[in-house]
Amino acid sequence: MKKTPKSRVQSSSLRSESQARNASRTGKSIKKAGLNVDQLNRLSAAIHQDVEADLYDGAACIVARHGMIGLHEAVGFANRAANRPLHIDDVFNILSVSKAFTDVIVLSLIERGELALTTRVGDIIPELNARVKEAVTVFNLLTHTAGSPQALFPVAAELMGNLDAVIKAICPMELIAVPGQSVSYSPLWGHALLGEIIRRLDRAQRTLRDIFQNELFGPLGMKDTAMGRRKDLSSRIVPIVAHDLSFGNMSAKEVEEHNRYITEDAEIPWMGCVSTVYDLFRFAEMLRRGGELDGVRILSPASVKQATTVQTGALANDYYALMMEKQGIKPPPANIGLDFQIRGEGVGPNAMGNLTSPGTYGKFGLGGTGFWVDPERDVTFVFLRSGLLEHLNDTARYQRISDMAMAAIL
């Protein structure tokens, strides 16, 4: 957890890499994409100011429109305590953004006819608790409407990367609500089961790491993305450091324990992937383009549309509601698609900002990683931050940066 005094790298050295990266994307090329150069410069300056003010430690960011990148930079520190600067190709633990990869592979199984949204989870994992077997479907898992137990740490730390051990621990667990009647974000339980479904349906009996690599990361050219901390990426890993002392349902110490879970051979389909800002941009671009990128089709447009359309009606997200009510904030609708978060109508605390269109969708990880796509304005935004923040603080910082990014759209 962050207790060290501020370290500083000269502003000129913090800026040098982003300036070099963006030099070829200024002027006419940015204007062709319908982006405001001056506003992108303001956004860049705001991120530098945040880091210099010690609001967080560093950030890697991409702003693009029509697939053309207008801003691509890394600012600040990968590890402030070690005075290690953040580089554009540094590899982040993206935590719950990993769920989006699991979602896409589940959707691809549905397209192949091997699974359905209405499939009962117990038909594939029969050792589940009887009530779960009878009532919970794949749709419930994807929409966080299963009534699932929170189960943040169902096994000892050294076993969190062992999916077999996790599944054995969560299968007997009881539901805490009637499936389909409420929304409560499931940090672990739901996507652990989805990952196990992927494994059990794989005829080649591959590891989950290999399935993700062969079916998603490889085809999309996401060369610096992996489930688990691949050995060749280890020198570029950005450590998980808690900038805030409390994270609601977790302490700062528990947040930093994630560094222990995500090992080279870990299989953690709810939070165990690592990636770079550019690789995550490629994934988001695939979604923006209706499931295809560079001639490689991962999903059909129909699946992307369904996944990024609100499936939870007006229900609030109970997982965050109490936290918001304590701060005097009225909880908004959950606005969850097939796990993807949708911006929705109205004004309020929102990581996607209040300037994005209502159909904007994305995925976010604990304390500072995420992406969103505005399909109406054809914008893709990725922001990965070092120095993780508590949920409401994180949302406020993300909202500010997202609104500044949208202000660059002409």
Which residues are covered by each model-predicted region?
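Short loop/turn microsegments at loop-to-beta-strand junctions
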Residues: 57-59, 70, 207, 367-370
